[in-house]
Regions:
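Conserved beta-strand in the GNAT
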Residues: 44, 50-58, 65-70
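Conserved acetyl-CoA-binding loop-helix of GNAT-fold acetyltransferases
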Residues: 71, 77-90
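A conserved beta-turn-beta hairpin within the catalytic core of GNAT-like acetyltransferases
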Residues: 58-67, 76, 95-98
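A short beta-loop-alpha structural element at the N-terminal edge
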Residues: 1-11
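Conserved GNAT acetyl-CoA-binding A-motif
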Residues: 85, 92-104
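Conserved beta-strand-loop-alpha-helix junction that forms the acyl-donor binding cleft
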Residues: 73, 102-112
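A short helix-loop-beta-strand connector motif used in the catalytic cores of GNAT acetyltransferases and
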Residues: 32-44, 65
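Conserved active-site tyrosine of GNAT-family acetyltransferases
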Residues: 115
Length: 115
């Protein structure tokens, strides 16, 4: 993921039922900070040039954290979420991170079904 993906990623987040967003962390500046700190562990999935999935992943040097995994509704069930998760976990492993925490909101029933 790169900062230029922000608008498409943000629209995907907004269209995802149960996604918890806030004005600071999920702003363009917030994502820029996150990507600078975690340049190799955040991913998008594209279909014909359109972003259809995303995952934010970072770590504090000890434990990895997964945030904002989303796949456009008409692309769900095709393995995109699993591929994004595998990419994020692989990126953490390459940095020596072997523990991962997940942020999942109770109200996100679709997302919780995936996890």
């Amino acid at each position: 993921m790169i900062l230029a993906d922000y608008e498409a990623v943000y629209q995907l987040w907004r269209s995802t039922p149960g996604m918890g967003l806030n004005n600071v962390d999920d702003s363009r500046a917030g994502l820029e900070r996150f990507l600078k700190r975690n340049p190799t562990s955040c991913f998008v999935a594209e279909e014909e040039g359109t972003i259809v999935g995303t995952i934010l992943c970072g770590h504090d040097g000890r434990r990895g954290y997964l945030y904002h995994a989303a796949v456009a509704q008409n692309y769900q069930g095709r393995g995109i979420g699993t591929a994004l998760l595998d990419a994020a976990l692989s990126a953490l492993e390459q940095e020596g991170i072997t523990k991962v925490a997940l942020v999942a909101l109770k109200r996100n029933s679709e997302g919780n079904g995936f996890w």
